Amino acid sequence: MATTVTPEPLTALSRWYLYAIHGYFCEVMFTAAWEFVVNCNWKFPGVTSVWALFIYGTCILIVERMYLCLKDRCNVLLRCIIYTLWTYFWEFGTGFLLRQFNACPWDYSEFKYNFMGLITAEYAVPWFCASFIVERLVIRNTLRLRFDEVAESGQAEERLDRGGGGRGGRRGRGARAGATSANGYVKVD
């Protein structure tokens, strides 16, 4: 008789990694779209810096903490305004620090409403929309992810399938029928 193991939530480092990859990808896609809109460049050259991994991963992990503290206290509109203000603060702080080492990958000096070339008011709406997407899609779904110790090795299921004791051709009708597995290692509630 198999014992049930409660799946573990993702660690902070695992969530940080997912947030970093998400931010990095969005940065590349945004710069590609911006290049197309501004210069009608059909090559869609999306660019970013490796620093974006640290910047986005840490920023979104902090937004996650804010979400957990604020979700029962204020509505989504107010939360997204708070996230946007935090994003400006974080972008300015990390940009200012990186500029000390000549490593800041962005410069908003050409924008009319920039401050020290590190932040610009023209990005308020995109940052607000990004905050909404991050809360509603990224953070909420990432917090639902679980490590499933049982599915650590795909070999266990293969052996059960070959021996007739597993799900085999009856996929979805076993004891784990209600569980959904993203890739055999991560389980979503």
Curated annotation (Swiss-Prot):
GO terms for cellular component: membrane. The keyword Kinase does not apply. The chain crosses the membrane at residues 18-38, 44-64, 76-96, 115-135. Coiled coil: none annotated. Keywords: Membrane, Transmembrane, Transmembrane helix. The keyword Ion transport does not apply. Residues 1-17, 65-75, 136-189 are cytoplasmic. Residues 39-43, 97-114 are extracellular. InterPro entries: CmpB_TMEM229 (IPR010540). Residues 158-189 are annotated as: Disordered. It is a multi-pass membrane protein. It is found in: Membrane. It holds the Pfam family ABC_trans_CmpB. Belongs to the TMEM229 family. This is Transmembrane protein 229b. It comes from Danio rerio. The lineage of its organism: Eukaryota, Metazoa, Chordata, Craniata, Vertebrata. The gene is tmem229b.
